[in-house]
Structure formats: C-alpha cells, structure tokens
Amino acid sequence: MVLIRVLANLLILQLSYAQKSSELVVGGDECNINEHRFLVALYEYTSMTFICGGTLINQEWVLTAAHCDRDTIYIYIGMHDKYVKFDDEQGRHPKEKYIFNCSNNFTKWDKDIMLIKLDYPVNYSEHIAPLSLPSSPPSMGSVCRVMGWGAITPTNETLPDVPHCANINILDHALCRAVFPGLPATSRTLCAGVLQGGTDTCNRDSGGPLICNGQFQGIVFWGWYPCAQPRVPALYTKVFDHLDWIQSIIAGNTDAACPP
C-alpha cells in the first residue's frame, strides 16, 4: 500500500493537499479473504470512483481520514474484489459525517480523522465484522498491519482489484520529524514504516487502518512520493488520542468537548 507522497515544499505549504488519499500498499501481498472484515471502501458516488479506505468500528459507524471527505460518498462493506461481489457484501450512504476540529492542544497535523454514521446498520456476516478500538497506544517497535486498495507500485498508480496487506513497524517519532518539516514533537500521529524501504502505504490507501496486536491504532494519513523509500516512514492519525471524541460522538453527543 503506497501513500500519496509529495515534494517537501508542497508538504510544508499545502498540508491539506498532500495527504495519502490515493495511496495503496506497496510491497505487500493480496490480503487473506477473511483478514479484513472491517475494511471498507469509499467511493465518490456520482462517478463511482474509488477514493479511500475506512474502518467499520460498529454496525453504524465508520472511521476514516478527514481528507477523504466528498460531497457524495458511497461505502462498500464486506468487499474483497472490486468486480466480484460477495453475497453478503453491503453498501451504505453516510447519514451524518463528523470531522474532528478541535484546536486546544491539537495542530493541523492532528485533525485528519472523520466519523461517518451509516444511513442504516450493517449486518455482521462471514465477511463483515468491526475492528476493536485501542485500549492503549502501541509501543515503539510494534509490528503492525496495513491494508487497502491503494497503489501497489511506488511511482505509477497501479491500483489492484483486491486489497493488499503488509507488515510495518512503529518507529521513533523523530524519524518522521526529520522527513516532514513542521511536524511538532507533540503531534498526535504515529510514525510507521520499514526503514530499509520497499513496503509502505501509498496512493488511495488513505483512510485505511493501521492495526497493532489486533487493535485499530492508526488511520493512513500522510506519506512521501514516491512511496516506500528507505528511511522515509509515513504518518498515521493516532486513534488512541481521539478516543474521547470518537466515543462521545457515537454516544450521541455531537457537541463533544475537545480532548485535553
């Protein structure tokens, strides 16, 4: 899965346009058909163009990246092959969308997260099940799983019909600060990748999950172009640091207070 990468000067000046909205997993393999029951695919509804991944966290809610937002979205749940439909595959429209917009102790790097309430609940099935929210943040060095229908080549946008999966590592935040000028030391993001290169999220992997020890720890957010370069990790929105907001919105408090 290779994330959309941008030149350093564009990264500094145009954060909102440099995200991995089109990134795919580079260096991975086709996911096992039953290992991504929570992975959803977001399409722009009017053109039915694939735009991003997302993660089902219960029967009514999907968590994805804010930069994946579009005026019209259609969500496929339980999909593996884009062109071969499972009997239990389901489709939903957003009923409500909530984008994190807190300013206290949160910078522009910390806000790429969106909750989508589905127009009606999904039915869990052989290919559909939620992913658990984290009970604690991941530790540095953790081996984590990334997945998506994003680009599988570092430079040419070769998009697969099926999701690809790969293992990457949680890395020292200082490595990402060296790559992404302006990234604060206190950023509520995770730095993850493979230091020797060759494996990464990429274009159109945006919004998909970073899974560590079976828990939903990160959302594909930002990376470099070309993807999968040595010593160039990627950034993932840190789900654990947004838990209070997520749980408040799901509980019906749409005016949820910003986390500390």
Swiss-Prot record:
N-terminal signal peptide = 1-18
What is the top-level taxon of the source organism? Eukaryota
Q: What Pfam families has UniProt attached to this entry?
A: Trypsin
Propeptide spans which residues?
19-24
Q: GO MF terms on file?
A: serine-type endopeptidase activity; toxin activity
InterPro entries from the entry? Peptidase_S1_PA, Peptidase_S1_PA_chymotrypsin, Peptidase_S1A, Trypsin_dom, TRYPSIN_HIS
Entry annotation: catalytic residues = 67 (charge relay system), 112 (charge relay system), 206 (charge relay system)
PROSITE patterns linked to this entry: TRYPSIN_DOM, TRYPSIN_HIS
Q: What start-end ranges are recorded for coiled-coil regions in this protein?
A: none
- Which processes are annotated in GO (biological process)? proteolysis
The EC number(s) attached to this protein equal 3.4.21.-
Q: Which UniProt keywords apply?
A: Disulfide bond, Glycoprotein, Hemostasis impairing toxin, Hydrolase, Protease, Secreted, Serine protease, Signal, Toxin, Zymogen
* Disulfide bond positions: 31-165, 52-68, 102-258, 144-212, 176-191, 202-227
Domain Peptidase S1, first and last residues per copy: 25-251
Task: Give a GO cellular-component term.
Answer: extracellular region
Name where it's found: Secreted
CDD domains documented for this protein: Tryp_SPc
Q: Which residues are glycosylated?
A: 101, 105, 123, 156
Please list the tissues where expression of this protein has been recorded: Expressed by the venom gland.
The task this protein performs is described as:
Snake venom serine protease that may act in the hemostasis system of the prey.
Subunit composition and interactions: Monomer.
Q: Which family does it belong to?
A: Belongs to the peptidase S1 family. Snake venom subfamily.
Protein name as it appears in the record: Snake venom serine protease 2B
In which organism is this protein found? Craspedocephalus gramineus (Bamboo pit viper)
Give the source lineage, highest ranks first: Eukaryota, Metazoa, Chordata, Craniata, Vertebrata
Q: Which gene encodes it?
A: TLG2B
